[in-house]
């Protein structure tokens, strides 16, 4: 094991210049790992954090392509934006209860990640946090979770089921980004996703949220949901059973479009608006075709 006795790299202009092989052990006493500190280092396969560490900065370990495991310490509070993005060999993460902040895209494109256990106190999973983790099969969400950002799990094509905690209040809708990037639904193109449980308390099923989840077979929308967003379940080609409840008011365009296995649906009396294209190219008799729009 190789111990680094002193590391200070607060920004991209002062990046760590060490060549580190094997196991990187951050020494006791270190409280922060600065932005970009170890980004693009490809020589070490494991990282051990000290008990004193509080914060991992933005992009601190981004694109460390040999990194297979990280030992997160109790006492860690913050994981910055893109902190482990592109760590393509990382296989598993388990976050301690002390973590309250997980930055945007923190684990994006960790393509070998199989399991993420978030036993932390975070209330938000921010946009793109686990997007394109194509090997991810298991995700355990924190009991404190209230909000899941857009594209948080987009493209996690091996993910088969998700159980949301009762604390969940909202999924993020499609955001307007100033940089012009295309924003995707929270679970868009999770092509292996078969089972979901949406808890009472969620008021909106946001745009594109389960778009392209071609293995999803059934879904129950709780009575707290007022709106099903545009293209929310579009392209869910195996979806055959949808249970809607009183309380639902609006079904927007393409919400169940291109769902050929969906042949019947009961619309509650509480529904005030159904977009004419809500069920385009579905199996429901008389539903419009995409070429009609």
Each predicted region: which residue ranges?
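Consensus positions within tandem repeat domains that build extended binding/scaffold surfaces
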Residues: 34-37, 57-60, 80-83, 103-106, ...
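Short, conserved catalytic or adaptor-binding loops enriched in Gly and charged residues
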Residues: 14-18, 186-187
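Structural signature of tandem-repeat unit edges
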Residues: 1-9, 17-32, 42-55, 65-78, ...
């Amino acid at each position: 094991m190789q111990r680094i006795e002193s590391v200070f790299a607060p920004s991209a202009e002062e990046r760590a210049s060490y060549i580190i092989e094997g196991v990187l052990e951050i020494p006791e006493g270190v409280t922060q790992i600065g932005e970009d500190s170890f980004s693009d280092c490809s020589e070490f396969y494991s990282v051990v954090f000290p008990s004193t560490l509080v914060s991992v900065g933005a992009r601190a370990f981004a694109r460390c392509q040999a990194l297979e495991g990280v030992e997160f310490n109790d006492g860690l509070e913050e994981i910055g934006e893109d902190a482990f993005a592109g760590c393509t060999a990382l296989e598993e993460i388990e976050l301690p209860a002390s973590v309250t902040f997980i930055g945007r895209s923190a684990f994006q494109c960790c393509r070998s990640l199989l399991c993420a256990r978030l036993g932390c106190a975070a209330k938000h999973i921010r946009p793109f946090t686990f997007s394109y983790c194509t090997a991810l099969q298991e995700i355990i969400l924190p009991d404190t979770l209230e909000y899941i950002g857009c594209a948080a799990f987009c493209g996690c094509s091996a993910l088969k089921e998700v159980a949301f905690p009762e604390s969940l209040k909202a999924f993020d809708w499609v955001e307007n980004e100033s940089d012009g990037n295309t924003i995707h639904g929270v679970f868009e193109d999770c092509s292996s996703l078969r089972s979901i449980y949406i808890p009472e308390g969620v008021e909106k099923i946001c745009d594109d949220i389960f778009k392209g989840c071609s293995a999803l077979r059934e879904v129950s929308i709780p009575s707290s949901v007022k709106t099903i967003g545009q293209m929310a379940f579009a392209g869910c080609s195996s979806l055959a059973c949808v249970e809607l409840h009183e309380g639902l008011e609006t079904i927007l365009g393409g919400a169940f479009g291109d769902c050929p296995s969906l042949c019947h649906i009961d619309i509650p009396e509480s529904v005030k608006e159904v977009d004419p294209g809500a069920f385009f190219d579905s199996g429901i008799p008389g539903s419009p075709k995409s070429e009609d729009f």
